[in-house]
């Protein structure tokens, strides 16, 4: 899980979702998981 100021899609499998006001990226590749913080 990467914590970043700006979350971006890193590949075509990445999805940007909002979970209780936290922006997250979920992906098939676990190295691409991110959250904004």
Swiss-Prot record:
Q: Name one GO biological process term.
A: translation
Q: Does the keyword Zinc apply?
A: no
Q: Which PROSITE patterns match?
A: RIBOSOMAL_L36 (PS00828)
Entry GO CC = cytoplasm; ribonucleoprotein complex; ribosome
In terms of InterPro entries, this protein maps to: Ribosomal_bL36, Ribosomal_bL36_sp
Q: Name one GO molecular function term.
A: structural constituent of ribosome
Pfam families named among the record's database cross-references: Ribosomal_L36
Q: Which UniProt keywords apply?
A: Ribonucleoprotein, Ribosomal protein
Q: Which family does it belong to?
A: Belongs to the bacterial ribosomal protein bL36 family.
What name is this protein filed under?
Large ribosomal subunit protein bL36
- Corresponding gene? rpmJ
């Amino acid at each position: 899980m990467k914590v970043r100021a700006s979350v971006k899609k890193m590949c075509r499998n990445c999805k940007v979702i909002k979970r209780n006001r936290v922006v997250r990226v979920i992906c098939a590749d676990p190295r691409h998981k991110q959250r904004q913080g």
